[in-house]
Amino acid sequence: MNDSTPYVPPMVWQWEQESEGRFANINRPVAGPTHDKELPVGKHPLQLYSLATPNGVKVTMLLEELLAIGKEGAEYDAWLINIGQGDQFGSGFVDINPNSKIPAMVDHSTAPPTRVFESGAIMLYLAEKFEAFAPMQGPERAE
């Protein structure tokens, strides 16, 4: 392409090159599930689907802190999503998080159940739900 020819993006972008490398299977340039796989659901209201990555651990730490201060309803079941094996692209996980990224959580104490994904959004949701660890109003909330 020379400088005098303007770039015109295609109407539908398609990935034409296979990814390579060690971590190629944890990201994809397209959305949607690659396979059917139901997610397990335990006995507690909160179901966390994650892996022990920095973002995954953040949510687990907050849930444990909520339990430590005696917050009723903060009990949870944690389920391993092995991103190295592509678990995040299963239909059950994609139903919760269409971005196919960990962590993701489902709150079954609401009707219908609330799907929350991305670590920051989950942490804010939990702080608001349990009125703990974050100011709820005013400048303190922004700071």
What is each stretch, according to the model?
Residues 1-143:
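GST-like domain detector, emphasizing the conserved glutathione-binding G-site
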